[in-house]
Amino acid sequence: RDWERREFERRQNELRREQEQRREELL
């Protein structure tokens, strides 16, 4: 069941990157 955690982390990383990009656009 190690792939579940890996998938979760990958999704979190993608979300974080999207938020950072949006933040930069707002600035």
Curated annotation (Swiss-Prot):
The keyword Phosphoprotein does not apply. Keywords: Antimicrobial, Fungicide. The keyword Ribosomal protein does not apply. GO terms for biological process: defense response to fungus; killing of cells of another organism; negative regulation of translation; xenobiotic metabolic process. IC(50) of 20 pM in rabbit reticulocyte. Has weak antifungal activity toward C.comatus and P.piricola but not toward M.arachidicola. Inhibits cell-free translation in rabbit reticulocyte lysate system. This is Alpha-benincasin.
